[in-house]
Amino acid sequence: MKVHEFSNGFSSSWDQHDSTSSLSLSCKRLRPLAPKLSGSPPSPPSSSSGVTSATFDLKNFIRPDQTGPTKFEHKRDPPHQLETHPGGTRWNPTQEQIGILEMLYKGGMRTPNAQQIEHITLQLGKYGKIEGKNVFYWFQNHKARERQKQKRNNLISLSCQSSFTTTGVFNPSVTMKTRTSSSLDIMREPMVEKEELVEENEYKRTCRSWGFENLEIENRRNKNSSTMATTFNKIIDNVTLELFPLHPEGR
């Protein structure tokens, strides 16, 4: 009896042990699925997963097409530093460069082509910093200044000519005076001729009435009565006329 009970007890304890072990194994197998079924908040990622996610994000954001602009911005830092200093980017020509450019301009060069600009830039680079655009704009500005200078000279010459004509030949006061004086002279000439004709006719009539047609009349063009009186006195002194007796009767 005791052996049977022991065997029964052992078998029951073994069965319990097997059931507990099977339950523990089943729980271990179902343990990873427990958080999903329970709906509990997910556990924070481990350090290794965080590193991998961080590296993945960097690879996504840093791309080959974006590396170019970053390098370009890095290269543009020196010009930005130059802009902080006023006049840093401007071309400051030397005396030698200006002298050579003026010599070329006086020689007849006005609009150099690309090859000429490149050659001039190469030669002038020996005397200081210079670029091709500096050479091009120098010629353009020099031509513009020369055109403005010519316009100023033309305006000055025109103003001088206009002032000379207004004060000299084409002065309205002078022209009016000359016109009035010339018109008066023209009007006086026929009047003088008429007076001379009248005087000559009067002298001829008097001479004919006195019988001296061949008498030379002096000072026919004199207009004053005094000259007429002197001529009459000469005539009377030279010839005694019966019309004017020296001793009239009745006195």
UniProtKB/Swiss-Prot annotation:
<dbReference type="GO" id="GO:0051301">
    <property type="term" value="P:cell division"/>
</dbReference>
<feature type="compositionally biased region" description="Basic and acidic residues">
    <location>
        <begin position="71"/>
        <end position="83"/>
    </location>
</feature>
<protein>
    <recommendedName>
        <fullName>WUSCHEL-related homeobox 4</fullName>
    </recommendedName>
</protein>
<dbReference type="GO" id="GO:0003677">
    <property type="term" value="F:DNA binding"/>
</dbReference>
<dbReference type="GO" id="GO:0007165">
    <property type="term" value="P:signal transduction"/>
</dbReference>
<comment type="similarity">
    <text>Belongs to the WUS homeobox family.</text>
</comment>
<dbReference type="GO" id="GO:0010087">
    <property type="term" value="P:phloem or xylem histogenesis"/>
</dbReference>
<dbReference type="InterPro" id="IPR001356">
    <property type="entry name" value="HD"/>
</dbReference>
<keyword id="KW-0238">DNA-binding</keyword>
<feature type="region of interest" description="Disordered">
    <location>
        <begin position="33"/>
        <end position="93"/>
    </location>
</feature>
<dbReference type="InterPro" id="IPR044186">
    <property type="entry name" value="WOX4"/>
</dbReference>
<comment type="function">
    <text>Promotes differentiation and/or maintenance of the vascular procambium, the initial cells of the developing vasculature. Part of the TDIF-TDR-WOX4 signaling pathway that plays a crucial role in the maintenance of the vascular meristem organization during secondary growth. Is required for promoting the proliferation of procambial/cambial stem cells but not for repressing their commitment to xylem differentiation in response to the TDIF signal.</text>
</comment>
<dbReference type="GO" id="GO:0010067">
    <property type="term" value="P:procambium histogenesis"/>
</dbReference>
<feature type="DNA-binding region" description="Homeobox; WUS-type">
    <location>
        <begin position="86"/>
        <end position="150"/>
    </location>
</feature>
<feature type="region of interest" description="Disordered">
    <location>
        <begin position="1"/>
        <end position="21"/>
    </location>
</feature>
<keyword id="KW-0217">Developmental protein</keyword>
<keyword id="KW-0805">Transcription regulation</keyword>
<dbReference type="InterPro" id="IPR009057">
    <property type="entry name" value="Homeodomain-like_sf"/>
</dbReference>
<feature type="compositionally biased region" description="Low complexity">
    <location>
        <begin position="11"/>
        <end position="21"/>
    </location>
</feature>
<keyword id="KW-0539">Nucleus</keyword>
<keyword id="KW-0804">Transcription</keyword>
<dbReference type="GO" id="GO:0005634">
    <property type="term" value="C:nucleus"/>
</dbReference>
<dbReference type="GO" id="GO:0003700">
    <property type="term" value="F:DNA-binding transcription factor activity"/>
</dbReference>
<keyword id="KW-0371">Homeobox</keyword>
<dbReference type="Pfam" id="PF00046">
    <property type="entry name" value="Homeodomain"/>
</dbReference>
